[in-house]
Amino acid sequence: MTQWKRRSRRKGMRTRNNKQLIKLILTKSREICNTIRPSQYNKRGRPRVYEDHLIVAALLIKILENLSLRDLEERLKDLFPKVPDFTTLHYRFRKLNRGYLKELIHRTAKEIMEKLQAKEFYCLIADGTGFGYAQAYELKWKKGKELRNVKSHVKTEVLVGVVRNKAIVVDINTGKSYADENMLLRSMLKELGFRARYFLGDAYYGKSAGVLEEIKKLRMESIVPVRDTAHTRVRNMYRLWAKRNYEIRRKVYRKNRYRVEQVIGIVKNRFGDRDNVYDFEIASLYVLGRFVLYNLILLLKLLLLCLNLLRITWASSRFIL
């Protein structure tokens, strides 16, 4: 029994059978790192001994199996002949290019759509959430205004696409605590590489004419509730457009709005909503890794389903012959 297995039994870590998923992680990490320019390193600091694809795979395995850096080092010895120690892993996580993880989300989303034989999403849904780091004890006894002064969480904007009754993570953007969700979403929409019929969001996005303008440029119908009261009359053309769409297509909103919250809930339940780190950059890296794993798990399920269908087809054709 290896040292990692002894530790995992003693500490009660999650040790599910993730062999197929880990193989997919290793494959996709290598593909992404071969197509994107590597992380920038200057002459100062530690020499770059290990390839970026190994570091990306190590990050995802750490999140998947809820390992500490020391246990991750032992776990990697089962997968690679030469692995970095836990201090090098921490150092390389800090230097890792976040573009790798964002590109993994985009490419897995495209691959899932290809498996589903879909050219565009039925709707895109946006919502904001938060993932905590550090100061976990302090949050337990503070309330109200005191709680809002604690700034140890990663503001996360999630964009989910729905197609063929599947919810797929399309893009993720992170910012400091209490960052503006409209600003985070607007930067994602400017670089969006997917098409959709509808865009869904809560009333907060209805306040931003800039976000609604970007949605109209993408030729999507914005179904966003816009508050129109005696003291806050709607006069902006984009907000009026969103208000009319919401009144006409309210059923579409009610049937699909919950899907983004469902995805966030699945990610938090499976991989946790808090990280025991003190650095914001590493905490935001772990947040991106969580949503990468969500897409990879969904992709793996579709690949296994296609494989099973091929086996059934082959067996039935052999029986007929």
From Swiss-Prot:
Q: Which Pfam families match?
A: DDE_Tnp_1 (PF01609)
Q: Which GO terms describe its biological process?
A: DNA transposition
The record's section on InterPro entries has: Transposase_11
Q: Which UniProt keywords apply?
A: Plasmid
Give the molecular function GO annotations: DNA binding; transposase activity
- Protein name listed in UniProt: Uncharacterized protein aq_1391/aq_1640/aq_aa40
What is the species listed in this Swiss-Prot or TrEMBL entry? Aquifex aeolicus (strain VF5)
